[in-house]
Each structure stands twice: as structure tokens, then as C-alpha cells.
Amino acid sequence: MRPPTQPLTQALPFSLRDALRGTGLQVPVIKMGTGWEGMYRTLKEVAYILLCCWCIKELLD
């Protein structure tokens, strides 16, 4: 007898947004009133993506 199957969205241990965040394809969501905190978070994510790209380039060279 087969075990019951789960829909794919419930079977995955992560959300699509989390998966996209890991690949650097996250679409930034800008909220009004976040001020410097939002800017800091965005710059930190951009720096992280650039660092990952640089590391991959160095590994491939």
C-alpha cells in the first residue's frame, strides 16, 4: 500500500521566495518608511551577491 502523497508545495522544506533569495534572484520589496534600515539591508544583499559572483569567478579561473 502506497503512503499518502503530499502536494509539492507542502513537501518542499522551503518557500519559493527563500529559494530565489539563495540564488540572488530576489526582487527587492521597498516599503515606505523603512529609512536607513532598508537601505542598509539592500546594500548588504548587493554586497553578498557581488562577493558570491567574485568567488565563483575565482573558482572557475
Swiss-Prot record:
Cellular-component GO terms for this entry: cytoplasm
A Pfam family recorded for this sequence: LEP503
InterPro entries xrefs: LEP503
Name recorded for this polypeptide: Lens epithelial cell protein LEP503
Organism: Mus musculus
Gene name in the database record: Lenep
